[in-house]
Amino acid sequence: MAEQKLVLERPLGQVALHLSVLQAFAARAVEKVEGVRPLHAGGGLKTIFASPEEGLHITLADDRVDVELRIAVVLGYPVHEVAQGVQQAVREDLEGLAGVRVGRVDVFVRQVIPPQEALVLETESEEGEENG
Amino acid sequence: MAKEEGFVSELGPEEGKVSISRDVIATIAGLAAAEVPGIAPPKGESFPRGEGARKLVDTQLAEGRVRIGIKVAVIYGHPVQEVTQKLQERIKQEIEKMTALPVEAVDVEVTKVVFPEEEPGGVG
């Protein structure tokens, strides 16, 4: 399947954003929110978002994008606030940085993770970043 | 007119003509892109020159006007619409200045986001 693109008409010509570019912005926005963790052990957010169906799904409409996210929240963090924080961060970065109009941002909280497990995940992903 | 001949500008019946190859135009576009803050080549450390530039830069001529298509990466943190607009302006400006060919449009395709910590070379 050809790479999907969001095409915006500008005075000097088209500006097309690949779907993977929008996904990268959304994934990075989620990482900024405290209390959010990857859905499964052993992978960072990026790993999960590498396969769009799993954690992050962006649908391109004519002039805007709709976002669907599946996240896990660390126990102890207020789930609703974290989810709202994710919605806000994703919307802000896609609008402010990518410069696209954002329609819906749907967040599905699929799991809560005990803090000690989250800690393990965090160390693992930090090590992974240093090696990569 | 053979396509490989390049873009021709007629200076006048007695002065002859100037032909500029696609590679030259593609290279100019790549060099212009390299100077725009927030824009990076989608692969490698610099925009390719010469024949290699054709992979990233598509040049078309219609009714005496040039249409450019360029693939780029955007460095994370820079507002995409702002830097792509600067890129369009810069490429149009440079090509018109250096080749005297009018540029009709510069189509930009953002294929990648580069996160500063992943950027080859690091601090720049």
Regions found by a protein language model. Name each.
Chain B
Residues 92:
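Glycine-rich active-site/cofactor-binding loop and its immediate structural neighborhood
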